[in-house]
């Protein structure tokens, strides 16, 4: 009986420690297909390795929020950090600038990662 209580107590302590871990998100912005001006494509913002799970992700066109953005389900990795994919259909042009803005408790201000079309 004492062993069961001790095991249960250790599990509770472990779970409490998981909530104390904070990791900032890693952000990658890329397209599904090689970009061509005037040709429809998908813009992706992959956010990973963050904890706790609450996060805000926005895709931006010329600094303004894109309204029609889809999100994958929140998932977690083996190390209990989380990852999420935000994506939208878009048609790139030579003049438009695209970015992903991420807000998370570990960041003092939102992290903005610009899409580099030559990568």
From Swiss-Prot:
Keywords: Disulfide bond, Immunity, Immunoglobulin domain, MHC I, Secreted, Signal. Pfam families: C1-set. It is found in: Secreted. Its main location: secreted. Disulfide bonds join 45-100. InterPro entries: B2Microglobulin (IPR015707), Ig-like_dom (IPR007110), Ig-like_dom_sf (IPR036179), Ig-like_fold (IPR013783), Ig/MHC_CS (IPR003006), Ig_C1-set (IPR003597), MHC/Immunoglobulin (IPR050160). One of its GO terms (cellular component) is MHC class I protein complex. Residues 25-114 form the Ig-like C1-type domain. Residues 1-20 form the signal peptide. GO terms for biological process: antigen processing and presentation of peptide antigen via MHC class I; immune response. PANTHER family: BETA-2-MICROGLOBULIN (PTHR19944:SF62), MHC CLASS II-RELATED (PTHR19944). Belongs to the beta-2-microglobulin family. Heterodimer of an alpha chain and a beta chain. Beta-2-microglobulin is the beta-chain of major histocompatibility complex class I molecules. Component of the class I major histocompatibility complex (MHC). Involved in the presentation of peptide antigens to the immune system. This is Beta-2-microglobulin. It comes from Sigmodon hispidus. The lineage of its organism: Eukaryota, Metazoa, Chordata, Craniata, Vertebrata.
